[in-house]
Regions:
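Intrinsically disordered, low-complexity sequence elements enriched in Ser/Thr/Gly/Pro
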Residues: 1-2, 92
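Sec-dependent N-terminal signal peptides of Gram-positive bacterial secreted proteins and lipoproteins
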Residues: 2-24
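Terminal recognition/anchoring or ligand-binding modules at protein termini
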Residues: 13, 177, 234
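Generic structural motif recognizing short loop/turn segments at the entrances and edges of beta-strands
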Residues: 14, 135-137, 197, 247-251
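Intrinsically disordered, low-complexity segments enriched in small/polar residues
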Residues: 15, 64, 68-70, 245, ...
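A general structural signal for well-ordered secondary-structure junctions
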Residues: 15, 118-119, 162, 197, ...
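Active-site-adjacent loops and short helices of periplasmic peptidoglycan-processing enzymes
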Residues: 25-217, 221, 226-227
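Extracytoplasmic
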Residues: 218, 223-253
Length: 253
């Protein structure tokens, strides 16, 4: 029982990013944003009202007779899934489509673990780093840097490094005899194989794209599958990780 409860909690934590930060598809309408001429005080009040609206959204599992009542959340969607059985213990708008942002990298890790080896070489090409904009999550990898897939997954999952996620996808795809797009196709295929019906992924790092979206249920199904990969949980439970300097890479923490 204790292991099953821990598994359910881990599924909840994997999906927490969506419940707290995701934005729904279709796009936010003008009436859902503070007026352009609003003062800072008015904008804060507007945002507080939006959060209250999300908090007051009904929780579907609270409608089940005799089921424990779950709390509200300040997100538009949330889920707790029991990893052993797939039973949904808590659900709020679990099939609504949202922009997943960096929790995309959870699926990137799954596809990489299923198709690569931890000691595979990952080379950062021009495409891996050229898209980065100021403010994007990055550990500062440069073109032609080389690390292992294990190190790249640490960078992807601990630092949310966008260039590392791209490099993981590109190199795993290349090693399989294909390319970056093949990896993205595998992400979509695996999501569907796991029962996902409300997702479409167009990149490996979650940088915003109107055609890149998922749902709380789909992400929980992906998280459930990751219990077959203990190396994933070893990575995400690490507090700090250092990529040592080498002849092909500078030190990164």
């Amino acid at each position: 029982m204790r292991k099953r409860l821990i598994a359910a909690l881990l599924i909840m934590l994997l999906c927490m990013g969506m419940s707290m930060t995701a934005y729904a598809v279709p796009q936010i309408t003008p009436e859902e944003q503070p007026p352009a001429e609003a003062t800072e005080e008015e904008a804060q009040a507007f945002k507080a009202a939006q959060l209250k609206k999300y908090y007051d959204m009904p929780v579907a599992t609270n409608e089940i007779k005799g089921w424990p009542q779950g709390p509200g959340t300040y997100g538009e969607a949330a889920i707790i899934m029991e990893a052993g059985t797939g039973a949904i213990l808590y659900g709020k708008n679990i099939d609504d489509q949202h922009y997943p942002a960096s929790i995309t990298k959870v699926l990137t890790a799954l596809v990489a673990l299923e198709n690569g080896k931890m000691d595979d070489k990952v080379t950062f090409t021009h495409d891996c780093v050229s898209f980065l904009q100021p403010g994007d999550s990055s550990i500062g990898m440069k073109e032609n840097d080389e690390i292992t897939l294990e190190q790249a997954l640490y960078a992807t999952l601990l630092a949310s490094a966008n260039e590392a996620a791209y490099a993981v996808a590109e190199n795993v795809g290349t090693n399989a005899g294909h390319d970056y797009q093949w990896f993205i196709d595998q992400m979509n295929a695996r999501c569907k194989e796991l029962g996902g019906t409300n997702s479409n992924f167009v990149n490996a790092n979650g940088l915003h794209d109107e055609n890149h979206y998922t749902s709380a249920r789909d992400m929980a199904l992906i998280g459930k599958e990751l219990f077959k990969h203990p190396e994933f949980f070893k990575i995400v439970q690490t507090l700090q990780y250092e990529i040592p300097s080498s002849g092909t890479c500078q030190q990164h923490v």
